Design a protein with these regions (language model features):
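Positively charged n-region of N-terminal signal peptides that target proteins for export
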Residues: 1-4
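C-terminal motif of bacterial Sec signal peptides marking the signal peptidase cleavage site
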Residues: 12-15
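Surface-exposed, beta-sheet-biased, low-hydrophobicity segments with strongly acidic/polar composition
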Residues: 17-213
Length: 213
C-alpha cells in the first residue's frame, strides 16, 4: 500500500510531469519561447498567453486589459492591483467575473456567432479543498490546501483523473465566455497544458479580448 501511495505521489509532482508523454496526455507539445502575452493581433483582438503554472504555491495573474502576467504567492497581500483571471496549476479564479462553458471548440467559430452566448454564467465560489499547495504529506493522507476563490466553470478546461496512476489528463477543447467585472467580454480556450518537453503545468491559452461583434 505504501508503495502505491509513493507511485501516486511521484506521478503528481511537477518535476515528474511528462514521464509518459504521448500515452496519457492529450495536450500537444509545441515549442513556445517566452512567457506572458506572447502574441496579439489588433485586427481581431485575438492573442495567445503562455505561462508557467508548475508551482503549487503560486498564482499567475493575467490582465487582459494591459496584457500583463504576474506571478505571485498565495496571500491576498500579493495580489496585483489589476487582473482579470488567475491560474494555479490547472485551477482558475476570476476578479469578479462570470463564466460560461460553451459548446463551441474554436474562437473563430465563437466570433462568427455574432453574440455572447446565453446561459447560466458561473461566478467564483469560496473553497477550502480545491487549491492544493502542499503534497509532502500525501503518503500519510495529508494534503495541504489553501483557502481561495475558485471558478468551477472555467476550471473545467482541463480534467485530471487521479483514479488511475499515472493520472489521465483531458482538455475540454471548448471556448469559455467570460463576462468581466467592468462589463467587457473575454473569450478564451486552453490549447495546451505542457511545454515542448512534455512537462505539465505550462499553459497555453488562446483568447479574444475585448470581444466585439
Amino acid at each position: 500500500m505504501k508503495r502505491l501511495f509513493l507511485i501516486a505521489f511521484l506521478a503528481l509532482l511537477p518535476s515528474c510531469n511528462g514521464i509518459f508523454p504521448g500515452i496519457y496526455d492529450s495536450g500537444e507539445s509545441d515549442l513556445v519561447t517566452g512567457y506572458g502575452f506572447i502574441a496579439h493581433n489588433p485586427s481581431d483582438n485575438s492573442g495567445k498567453v503562455y505561462i508557467d503554472a508548475t508551482d503549487y504555491t503560486k498564482w499567475v495573474y493575467l490582465d487582459f486589459h494591459g496584457r500583463t502576467a504576474v506571478t505571485a504567492g498565495m496571500s491576498e497581500e500579493e495580489v496585483p492591483a489589476e487582473w482579470d483571471i488567475a491560474v494555479h496549476r490547472y485551477d482558475v479564479k476570476t476578479n469578479g467575473a462570470a463564466v460560461l462553458e460553451t459548446g463551441i471548440t474554436g474562437l473563430e467559430l465563437f466570433m462568427s456567432s455574432g453574440k455572447m452566448p446565453e446561459g447560466e454564467y458561473v461566478e467564483d465560489e469560496w473553497t477550502t479543498e480545491k487549491i492544493i499547495v502542499d503534497m509532502s504529506g500525501m503518503m500519510d493522507g495529508n494534503i495541504g490546501y489553501s483557502e481561495s476563490w475558485y471558478n468551477p466553470e472555467l476550471s473545467k478546461w482541463l480534467k485530471v483523473d487521479t483514479s488511475t496512476m499515472p493520472p489521465l489528463y483531458s482538455m475540454s477543447h471548448k471556448v469559455y465566455a467570460v463576462k468581466l467585472a467592468d462589463g467587457s467580454n473575454l473569450a478564451l480556450k486552453l490549447s495546451n497544458y505542457m511545454d515542448a518537453s512534455g512537462v505539465k503545468g505550462f499553459m497555453t491559452i488562446d483568447y479574444v479580448y475585448p470581444v466585439e461583434f
